[in-house]
Amino acid sequence: PLTAQENSTAKVDESVDWDVFAEKNPKQCWAVSIPKKTVNTRNGRVVAVRRGDIALMVVYDPKAKVSGQIVFTGGYPFAPGSTVDVTIDGNKFALYTKDEWAWANQGDDAKIIAAMKKGAKAKLTARSSRGTRTEDTFSLLGFTAAVEDADKLCK
């Protein structure tokens, strides 16, 4: 989805801190945001690191029977076997990782989306394959409207 976003001219809406994209062929829709704050640490010290695109998304892909899938890319390869910890106003969830991508377990997508609709911010904490700890904080202002738009566009 992020590659599609980068190459897409199909931005159809923006809702405060979230954007909505929709592609027609194949039909895919997603709500996406970039972090408001990023902190990278190694051995407890703040470090400057190069990262690719960082984005938190909710994806809808009717052909693949995907409806409201949480997807995160941290802009680097995650440590093998690690998880991304998601904290939304005290509620904690884990995303599983593969390479530069992370997803919720299928049963958790709806729970995370519900928490995001009620919350003000989401903090995602992860570890790179080089041992860097990253903390990305996303605003949830406009999340509900963006997710509802993406869902409707892909019905």
Question: What are these model-predicted stretches?
Answer:
Residues L2-K155:
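A generic "folded-domain core" signal
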